[in-house]
A protein has these predicted regions:
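A conserved structural motif in NAD(P)-dependent oxidoreductases
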Residues: 132-143
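Alpha-helical segment proximal to the catalytic Tyr-Lys
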Residues: 52, 94-99
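Short C-terminal tail/terminal secondary-structure segment
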Residues: 71, 148, 152-172
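Active-site helix of classical SDR
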Residues: 47, 82, 90
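Substrate-binding pocket helix/loop in short-chain dehydrogenase/reductase
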Residues: 23-24, 31-36, 116-117, 124, ...
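Short, small/polar-rich loop/turn modules that mediate ligand/substrate recognition or access, typified
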Residues: 13, 98-102, 158-159
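Active-site loop immediately N-terminal to the catalytic Tyr-X3-Lys motif
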Residues: 25, 71-77, 135
Length: 172
């Protein structure tokens, strides 16, 4: 529909995600299907559907992954696996779609906290922030700026992941 309406497709940002705890011993198939479905399956098939128009426009794809793709979070087994798979998908698509389409990822750190998850109470949040080199949480605009950079100002970058986490990934 986008191509029909605007005549072209320049970018795809795969940002949809499910996020909830899946401690080992409590994981159900429905958890797997939900987390892998939103974090890997949907980006794969959206990217595949967009590949033709993106090749024509020499566009770009940005996947929003997570720093916990590289450093798994305790009790979030399936989420961490799904984000690691999305990082792998980013690299695979970069190879498959080059040289016409660039594919990269942005990995947020502490930006928005889940409201309904007691894992991230105020004490936990402050502990995480205290272990973040920049000593603050990020803003959604920090992610948006990184995505925009990869879409508009990074013509020689593909297959890469930019951590936007205040340095947290070097401290955990």
């Amino acid at each position: 529909q986008t191509v029909m309406r605007f005549g072209r497709l320049d970018a795809l940002v795969n940002n949809a995600s499910s996020f909830f705890a899946t401690p080992l011993g409590e994981i159900q198939l429905s958890h797997w299907d939900d987390l892998v479905g939103t974090n890997v399956r949907a980006p794969l098939f959206l990217s595949q559907a967009a590949a033709g128009p993106l090749r024509k426009s020499e566009g770009a794809i940005v996947n929003v992954t997570d720093i916990h793709a590289e450093r798994p979070m305790r009790n979030y087994v399936v989420y961490s696996i799904a984000k690691a798979a999305l990082t792998g998908l980013t690299r695979s698509l970069a190879r498959e779609l080059a040289p016409d389409v660039r594919v990269n990822a942005v990995a947020p750190g502490p930006i928005l906290w889940p409201e309904d998850d007691e894992t991230f109470d105020e004490v936990s949040r402050q502990r995480i922030i205290s272990h973040t080199p920049l000593k603050r949480e990020g803003e959604p605009d920090d992610i948006a700026r990184a995505v925009r950079f990869l879409l508009e100002d990074a013509p020689y970058v593909t297959g890469e992941t930019i951590n936007v986490d205040g340095g947290r990934s070097i401290a955990i």
